[in-house]
Amino acid sequence: MKQIIAKNGLILSLFAIITSGLIALTYFGTQEQIELQRQQTLLAILDELVPRGSYDNLMQHDCVLVTSQAYLGSNSPQHIYRATRAGEPVAAVIEATAPNGYSGRIELVVGLSGDATVSGVRVIDHKETPGLGDKIDLRISDWVLGFNNQQLTQDNASNWAVKKDGGQFDQFTGATITPRAVVSAVKNTALYYQANKEAIFSASNECRSQLASQG
């Protein structure tokens, strides 16, 4: 009887070890897949905002982390991805937050060229009302394309507002708060970039992705 119990115990132990190993392999395999998908999504967004042929570095692996609640809308670190050519600045894609959306925080990325012209804006995450505030999402409306090729200057700063507030950007019927929040966030991001461009491109690379280490 003792031999049978010992044998069964050994079998159960081996089974537990094998199961744990399979779970670990599945976990790490899943994590790698998640990271791969994240990198692919990131690269697709960067390609939309900065033409790949305009720079020669690995932009998705070249970034700095910054924190500016006043300008970037969050007290958590935000990524700034840097595009360079022959070591010279070409563009940057900056993560930003509009903290005052109608239904909460709106996460976005803003592409800015070397002279601080907006190359594009994409909303990454939001909880705005379907059929109203969700028009900030490019999948719903082309409203966000209105930022393309806009440049913030001292002379036109007052234009960086929705039309209801005397600016140039359309608001939505029945939903002014949402576009107002996004316009303000993009404007503040442009201001941050203009004030910190030199520091952004001279800082050490802080991107440490798994794919970069594997490559």
Swiss-Prot record:
Protein name: Ion-translocating oxidoreductase complex subunit G
GO molecular function, one term: FMN binding
SMART domains: FMN_bind
Keyword Heme: no
Entry's EC annotation: 7.-.-.-
Subcellular location: Cell inner membrane
Lineage: Bacteria, Pseudomonadati, Pseudomonadota, Gammaproteobacteria, Alteromonadales
Main location: membrane
Pfam family, one: FMN_bind
Segment forming the signal sequence: none
Alphabetical list of InterPro entries matching this protein: FMN-bd, Ion_transpt_RnfG/RsxG
Membrane spanning stretches: 9-29
Record family assignment: Belongs to the RnfG family.
Subunit structure: The complex is composed of six subunits: RnfA, RnfB, RnfC, RnfD, RnfE and RnfG.
PTM annotation (FMN phosphoryl threonine): residues: T176
Any one GO BP annotation for this protein: electron transport chain
Species, as recorded: Pseudoalteromonas atlantica (strain T6c / ATCC BAA-1087)
Function field: Part of a membrane-bound complex that couples electron transfer with translocation of ions across the membrane.
GO CC annotations on file: plasma membrane
Membrane topology classification: Single-pass membrane protein
Keyword Electron transport: yes
UniProt keyword annotations, A-Z: Cell inner membrane, Cell membrane, Electron transport, Flavoprotein, FMN, Membrane, Phosphoprotein, Translocase, Transmembrane, Transmembrane helix, Transport
Names of required cofactors: FMN
